Amino acid sequence: SPSQDFMRF
C-alpha cells in the first residue's frame, strides 16, 4: 500500500 511504501527497504 502507498502508506507503507516507505517501509520498502
From Swiss-Prot:
The keyword Mitochondrion does not apply. It comes from the Eukaryota. Keywords: Amidation, Neuropeptide, Secreted. Its main location: secreted. GO terms for biological process: neuropeptide signaling pathway. GO terms for cellular component: extracellular region. The keyword GTP-binding does not apply. It is found in: Secreted. Belongs to the FARP (FMRFamide related peptide) family. Able to induce fluid secretion from the isolated salivary gland of Calliphora. This is CalliFMRFamide-3. It comes from Calliphora vomitoria.
